[in-house]
Amino acid sequence: MPSFDTVSEANMVEVKNAVDQAGKEISTRFDFKGSDARVEQKDRDLTAYADSEFQLNQVLDVLTGKLVKRNVDVRFLDRGKIEKIGGDKVKQVIKIKNGIETEAAKKIVRIIKDSKMKVQASIQGDAVRVTGAKRDDLQAAMAMLRKEVADLPLEFNNFRD
């Protein structure tokens, strides 16, 4: 029986490349000369540092631009609060989401069941497995999920025939 998995995970290699490129651009830009503006990465956490809130927003604009160029969906980014760290300096922690949360997975299963398509959906950890009798039904389910679930960056993998 054909099936596929619906997942939501960022390509961490591309994220690291984007962070490195953003760091290079920030270090060479004239408006950041003499400032402590930078972006650091630890596992799935990015931390942006700057001298002011305005500069922090510029650093984040550079970072999101680099992420978009490297085909990393910015919906993976979960921005935290802007924190003051001594003097005028500020920082912001950005978490990279991984996996589909249970509420979102239940929403995906409900959308598939409400569509009356000839496919079944089941939650498997942080992924949703969709099975059906025909490949055409699965492709229709993929198209429908792309259209219906706009707030999550979904990927389809592990396609089995």
Swiss-Prot record:
Pfam families per the UniProt record, alphabetical: DUF520
Gene3D superfamilies reported for this sequence: 3.30.70.860
InterPro entries listed in its UniProt record: DUF520, UPF0234-like_C, YajQ-like_sf
Coiled-coil intervals, chain numbering: none
An annotated GO cellular component: cytosol
Record bears the keyword Nucleotide-binding: yes
Keyword Transcription regulation part of the UniProt annotation: no
Any one GO molecular-function label of the UniProt entry: nucleotide binding
SUPFAM superfamilies per record: YajQ-like
Keywords of the record: Nucleotide-binding
NCBIfam families on file: PRK05412.1 (NF003819)
Known role: Nucleotide-binding protein.
Family classification: Belongs to the YajQ family.
Name by which UniProt lists this protein: Nucleotide-binding protein mma_0840
Source species of the chain: Janthinobacterium sp. (strain Marseille)
